[in-house]
Amino acid sequence: MGEIDKIKPWRVVYSSSAAKQKKKLPGPIVAQLASLTWDLEQHGPVQPDWSHYSPLRKGRDIPANAHHCHIKSGRPTYVVCWQVVDKTIKIIEIFYVGTHENAPY
């Protein structure tokens, strides 16, 4: 069973607010988000190959086990924030997707 768990992909879900934010994104940003989502599903929450990736410190608006990266640099910069909801059954929740200026960190 241990080997099966290693190859089992992560499940990526969106919080209700992130799902609404996603609907407002320009097409090229949605494509970048889809690419990041695929990487999260295949490789898990740690994504060092994405621009400005880092874990986030828990805070008032930041849950524990949170991470972020930039999916578009320049003006405006677009950011995605996600958290590990369950390591055992491999669930990641994207809780923010939008411009850097409105990011919760």
Where do the model's predicted regions map?
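Arg/Lys-rich, positively charged N-terminal/basic patches that mediate binding to nucleic acids
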Residues: M1-L40
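Generic secondary-structure microfeatures
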Residues: I29, T37, E41-G44, S73, ...
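A short, surface-exposed loop/turn module that caps and links secondary-structure elements
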Residues: Q42-S73
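Enriched for short, Lys/Arg-rich terminal
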Residues: M1-I7, K20, H70-Y105
